């Protein structure tokens, strides 16, 4: 698949993030001061698509955005990165989805998400996917399921329910997992999904080729039918903001996969990519190039 052809389609949210660092979360009916606040480009699908492109792999984005998207600077930014945005749906009456993300001193997070233009996913039908991988991130569960069913068998389907996991019914979650090759979850989502489905590890592996569970500073684990691969956390210079670490891990993992690496190396590339992102505020602020990722892995003698 040479040339300009996009290798990976990312389906799901493109959003504007407002990120706040607080000492601790306030109690109900109280207020706290916030030292600073800034707007960043975010949304799980967009974060992953940008991360993939920065690593030298062509990506495209399938998202619903609002009437404010063109003037937000985000559209121009994606075009300048040469990410294919021809599959964006523009709403004329709703604004681009927005997230207000609060992080405490222990890196716990609370997020308030404005759905906005994302309500239009229900009206859309999935396009034909002409890429090697279709990565389905946070977004509308019904549309995500449609995309997984359309892509499965023709494309490798990667699925990361993220913080939208509670919006999936048991039946819907099971059906999308049955149309997934690579299933990504963090440890909290993995516990929630396993409780909802009453699943053990083996139950997932009867349905997917690989289950990848990320555990923050404790690294990640890749489960396949044959083995369990422990991936260490790659140390960052200094952890400033954990927002977007998961999306960048997935970007690194999938980019390495389309470059032909085995799953262990994919996990290491994912972990190293995430180690850069946490060094700055914002999901896309400090996304590394492929060379920088490889250099950091070599520095850790991995």
From Swiss-Prot:
UniProt temperature dependence: Optimum temperature is 85 degrees Celsius. Thermostable.
Binding residues for ATP: 109, 186, 214-219
UniProt site positions, description: Transition state stabilizer: 250
E.C. no: 2.7.1.213, 2.7.1.73
Segments traversing the membrane: none
Family annotation (InterPro entries): Carboh/pur_kinase_PfkB_CS, PfkB_dom, Ribo/fructo_kinase, Ribokinase-like
pH effects: Optimum pH is 7.0. 50% of activity is found at pH 6.1 and 8.2.
Gene3D superfamilies the UniProt entry points to: 3.40.1190.20
Cofactor descriptive note: Can use Mg(2+) and Mn(2+) with equal efficiency in vitro, and to a lesser extent, Ni(2+).
Residues involved in substrate binding: 17, 33, 43, 47, 111-113, 163, 247
Pfam families assigned to the protein according to its UniProt record, in alphabetical order: PfkB
Known cofactor(s): Mg(2+); Mn(2+)
A GO MF label: nucleoside kinase activity
Keywords on record: ATP-binding, Kinase, Magnesium, Manganese, Nucleotide-binding, Transferase
Broad enzyme group: transferase
Active site (UniProt): 247 (proton acceptor)
Reactions accelerated catalytically: cytidine + ATP = CMP + ADP + H(+); guanosine + ATP = GMP + ADP + H(+); inosine + ATP = IMP + ADP + H(+)
Assembly mode: Homodimer.
PANTHER family given in the database record: RIBOKINASE, SUGAR KINASE
Protein's job: Catalyzes the phosphorylation of a wide range of nucleosides to yield nucleoside monophosphates. Shows the highest activity for inosine, guanosine and cytidine, but very poor kinase activity with adenosine, thymidine, uridine and xanthosine. ATP is the best phosphate donor, but can also use ITP and GTP. Shows extremely low activity with fructose-6-phosphate.
Entry's family note: Belongs to the carbohydrate kinase PfkB family.
Protein known as: Nucleoside kinase
Organism of origin: Methanocaldococcus jannaschii (strain ATCC 43067 / DSM 2661 / JAL-1 / JCM 10045 / NBRC 100440) (Methanococcus jannaschii)
Higher taxonomy: Archaea, Methanobacteriati, Methanobacteriota, Methanomada group, Methanococci
């Amino acid at each position: 698949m040479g040339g300009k052809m996009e290798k990976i389609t990312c389906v799901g949210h493109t959003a504007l993030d407002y990120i706040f660092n607080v000492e601790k979360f306030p109690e109900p009916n109280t207020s706290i001061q916030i030292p600073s606040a800034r707007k960043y480009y975010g949304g799980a699908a967009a974060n992953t698509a940008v991360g993939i492109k920065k690593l030298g792999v062509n990506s495209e984005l399938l998202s619903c955005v609002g009437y404010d998207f063109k003037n937000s600077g985000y559209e121009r930014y994606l075009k300048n990165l040469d990410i294919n945005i021809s599959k964006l749906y523009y709403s004329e009456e709703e604004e681009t989805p927005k997230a207000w993300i609060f992080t405490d001193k222990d890196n716990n997070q609370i997020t308030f998400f404005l759905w906005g233009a994302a309500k239009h996913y229900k009206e859309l039908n999935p396009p034909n996917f002409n890429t090697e991988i279709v990565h389905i991130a946070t977004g509308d569960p019904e549309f995500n399921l449609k995309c997984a069913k359309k892509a499965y068998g023709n494309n490798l389907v990667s699925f990361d329910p993220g913080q939208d996991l509670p919006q999936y019914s048991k039946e819907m979650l099971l059906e999308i997992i049955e149309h997934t090759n690579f299933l990504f979850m963090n440890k909290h989502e993995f516990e929630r999904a396993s409780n909802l489905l009453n699943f053990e590890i083996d139950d997932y592996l009867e349905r997917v080729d690989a289950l990848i569970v990320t555990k923050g500073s404790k690294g990640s684990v890749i489960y396949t039918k044959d083995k369990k691969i422990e991936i260490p956390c790659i140390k960052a210079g200094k952890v400033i903001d954990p927002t977007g670490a998961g999306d960048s891990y997935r970007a690194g993992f999938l980019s390495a996969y389309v470059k032909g690496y085995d799953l262990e190396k994919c996990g290491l590339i994912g972990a190293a990519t995430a180690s850069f992102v946490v060094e700055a505020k914002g999901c896309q602020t400090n996304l590394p190039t492929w060379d920088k990722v490889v250099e950091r892995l070599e520095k850790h003698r991995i």
